[in-house]
């Protein structure tokens, strides 16, 4: 499972965050300021100042939701959620193909995430394109939904042709850096939890959870 799509925020939570962060246009700056020298050449959007009061308050809200969500914890094994910021793209703006930096001042990027705060009918274009060995996946989600995908992936955002696209993006430093190892662990954990819910505890299931914990010890950093 290369990526996870999940309803993280309710529509009401998403709209409240959007209302909070768009009240003061002076808090928004050129998105190029947070991009690496290569990615900055293809980045064309605005981002909320990370150190602004509204930026800190709302990014903390998002981080708390992320780190308390059981499905995300199982999928991503987050050691640290970092670099969380809000971006907006108006007509003609987007982000060309690029890969995220492996290391940032805030931590290592194992997984990248985008939380869609605008509803799909509020803008045209703005699809997130993620490139993999299987081809390019085009993603445009409902308000409050998150997509988490490997930071090793080339990805881009199509130009917005109508309306405005507002999202929250950030990175996860995982306890398990390798994507394939992390996917194996997620499948094992999901299967074990499913069996526990369906059949209850058993000696055999204890061995499965033991294997999971010991694999995590071996594969983690």
Curated annotation (Swiss-Prot):
- Residues annotated as binding Fe cation are 98, 100, 155
- For this entry, list what GO says about its biological process: DNA damage response; intracellular iron ion homeostasis
Q: Does the keyword Chloroplast apply?
A: no
Entry EC no(s): 1.14.11.-
InterPro entries for the chain: Oxoglu/Fe-dep_dioxygenase_dom, PKHD_hydroxylase, Pro_4_hyd_alph, Pro_4_hyd_alph_FE2OG_OXY
> Under the GO molecular function aspect, what terms does this record hold?
2-oxoglutarate-dependent dioxygenase activity; iron ion binding; L-ascorbic acid binding
For whether the record's keyword set contains Electron transport, the answer is no
Q: What is the top-level taxon of the source organism?
A: Bacteria
Which HAMAP family does the annotation name? Hydroxyl_YbiX (MF_00657)
Can you say what this protein is called?
Answer: PKHD-type hydroxylase P9211_12561
The source organism is Prochlorococcus marinus (strain MIT 9211)
